[in-house]
Amino acid sequence: MGIEGILEKGFVTTSIDTVVNWSRTGSLWPMTFGLACCAVEMMHAGAARYDLDRFGLLFRPSPRQSDLMIVAGTLVNKMAPALRKVYDQMPEPRWVVSMGSCANGGGYYHYSYSVVRGCDRIVPVDIYVPGCPPTAEALIFGLIQLQKKIRRTNTIAR
């Protein structure tokens, strides 16, 4: 008795959390925060070959319209307040993906005086995508992991 048996009876039973989380995973609207070469791979993931639209991701130009921030590239001290300001402008619930070695922990420029050693010192990060630069496949895998994480959360119980 699959979905056909349920549809014959005319109703489906589920919880509100399941429906809300299902809709959130299918309509993530990322805002790009491209700081260096990782942003090129992020654009590659949104182009025709990989097409993030099929996962429900639609890039938005404004933080007030997005619920996901992808931090891609080297974060320097001068840019850190802008990152926090943009994060604070995003509506709840919001998620952050740290893309690339530089965003994760400073990367190649870790010992430079002007580099923040990981964007998780400025904003809370949900998913880390490793690589220098990470491939489009790695970013897509990270976004799928974020969708799985969203499905596991209890929205109403918060």
Curated annotation (Swiss-Prot):
[4Fe-4S] cluster binds at C37, C38, C102, C132. It is found in: Cell inner membrane. One of its GO terms (cellular component) is respiratory chain complex I. Binds 1 [4Fe-4S] cluster. Coiled coil: none annotated. One of its GO terms (molecular function) is quinone binding. One of its GO terms (biological process) is electron transport coupled proton transport. Its cofactor is [4Fe-4S] cluster. Keywords: 4Fe-4S, Cell inner membrane, Cell membrane, Iron, Iron-sulfur, Membrane, Metal-binding, NAD, Quinone, Translocase, Transport, Ubiquinone. It catalyses: a quinone + NADH + 5 H(+)(in) = a quinol + NAD(+) + 4 H(+)(out). It is a peripheral membrane protein. Signal peptide: none annotated. It is an enzyme of class 7 (translocase). NDH-1 shuttles electrons from NADH, via FMN and iron-sulfur (Fe-S) centers, to quinones in the respiratory chain. The immediate electron acceptor for the enzyme in this species is believed to be ubiquinone. Couples the redox reaction to proton translocation (for every two electrons transferred, four hydrogen ions are translocated across the cytoplasmic membrane), and thus conserves the redox energy in a proton gradient. NDH-1 is composed of 14 different subunits. Subunits NuoB, C, D, E, F, and G constitute the peripheral sector of the complex. This is NADH-quinone oxidoreductase subunit B. The gene is nuoB.
